[in-house]
């Protein structure tokens, strides 16, 4: 059976890039590579709400046999 693997097609589909291209993309002088402040603020607020809500629950271990955990 003949191997008909096309490396160029694979690179396009897999988004394979060279180290030099990554260095160029991640250069510290790149403008617009990060999130906006509004987006970052929203993510922090949502994360804070989720952490706050889940930390207020009374969690019981799954194997707990105490009355307070069963009811």
Swiss-Prot record:
Q: Which GO terms describe its biological process?
A: defense response to bacterium; killing of cells of another organism
Q: Which GO terms describe its molecular function?
A: signaling receptor binding
Post-translational modification as stated in the protein's UniProt record: Contains LL-lanthionine and DL-beta-methyllanthionine, when coepressed in E.coli with the flavecin synthetase FlvM2.
Q: Where mainly located? A: secreted
Which residues carry the post-translational modification 2,3-didehydroalanine (Ser), per the record? 36
Chain residue numbers at which the record places covalent cross-link Beta-methyllanthionine (Thr-Cys): 54-60, 62-65, 66-69
**Record-level GO cellular component terms:** extracellular region
Look up and give the organism this protein is from.
Answer: Ruminococcus flavefaciens
Q: Which residues form the signal peptide?
A: none
**Top-rank taxon, per record:** Bacteria
Q: Crosslink Lanthionine (Ser-Cys) sits at which residues?
A: 35-39
Q: Which keywords does this chain's UniProt record carry? A: Antibiotic, Antimicrobial, Bacteriocin, Lantibiotic, Secreted, Thioether bond
Q: List the propeptide region positions.
A: 1-33
Q: What does the function comment of this entry state?
A: Lanthionine-containing peptide antibiotic (lantibiotic) that is probably active on Gram-positive bacteria, since its analog [Del1]Flvbeta.c shows antibacterial activity against M.luteus. This activity is not synergistically enhanced by [Del2]Flvalpha.a, an analog of Flvalpha.a, which is encoded by the same operon than Flvbeta.c. The bactericidal activity of lantibiotics is based on depolarization of energized bacterial cytoplasmic membranes, initiated by the formation of aqueous transmembrane pores.
Q: Where in the cell is it found?
A: Secreted
Name of the protein described by the UniProt record: Lantibiotic Flvbeta.c
């Amino acid at each position: 059976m003949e191997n008909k693997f096309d490396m160029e097609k694979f690179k396009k589909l897999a988004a394979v890039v060279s180290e030099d291209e990554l260095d160029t993309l991640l250069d510290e002088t790149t403008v617009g590579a990060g999130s906006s402040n509004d987006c970052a603020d929203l993510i922090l607020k949502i994360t804070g709400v989720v952490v706050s809500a889940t930390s207020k629950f009374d969690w019981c271990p799954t194997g707990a046999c105490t009355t307070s955990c069963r009811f």
